[in-house]
């Protein structure tokens, strides 16, 4: 993989074994919006990222190289050799063969612990669109404003300190339902 910086954008070329849509939409994270085909707004680590994939190139728009190196490289797990891992799994594990062949481009996102924990609690008996809506509502209501992309406002997932005084009733207003007491306990 080659990395360059062009007019305020980090550009990755010769990217192998990565599919942005598969990675974001497979159900491991919920704090993103699809903007266009293979283009997304992603909220993570108190940052807002517009990212697009074009074949074997990935563009991180309006991103400092330092943010790529300190946040996004690890978040998207670009440093791991997924081709080697897949080759090993295909040779040794028949059970995983179909999954590996079906989801060739999924990377394991290195997410913030607190957001992952709360999202996991929310995910009980929920479909992905509803989980995403609850995460978005919690972020709008209790998180910090991160900015705007294409006329849409985005908010960071709230921190533990931002959630420490949130009540079960507040959480139920965000449509968490029976999960509210578990979220309060987790905070």
Task: Please place each PLM-identified region on the residue numbering.
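HhH-family (HhH-GPD) DNA N-glycosylase catalytic core used in base-excision repair
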Residues: 1-187
């Amino acid at each position: 993989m080659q990395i360059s910086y062009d007019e305020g954008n980090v550009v990755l070329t010769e990217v192998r074994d990565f599919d942005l849509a598969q990675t974001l939409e497979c159900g491991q994270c919920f704090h993103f919006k699809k903007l266009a085909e293979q283009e997304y707004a992603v909220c993570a680590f108190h940052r807002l990222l517009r990212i697009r994939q074009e074949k074997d190139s990935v563009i991180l728009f309006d991103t400092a190289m330092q943010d790529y190196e300190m946040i996004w490289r690890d978040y998207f797990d670009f440093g791991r050799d997924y081709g080697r891992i897949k080759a090993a799994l295909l040779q040794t594990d028949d059970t995983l063969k179909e999954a590996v062949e079906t989801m060739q481009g999924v990377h394991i996102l290195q997410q913030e612990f607190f957001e992952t924990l709360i999202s996991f609690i929310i995910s009980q008996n929920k479909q992905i669109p509803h989980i995403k809506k609850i995460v978005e509502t919690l972020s709008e209501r209790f998180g910090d404003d991160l900015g705007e992309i294409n006329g849409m406002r985005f908010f960071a997932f709230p921190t533990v300190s931002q959630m420490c005084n949130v009540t079960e009733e507040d959480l139920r207003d965000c449509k968490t339902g029976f999960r509210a007491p578990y979220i309060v306990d987790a905070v």
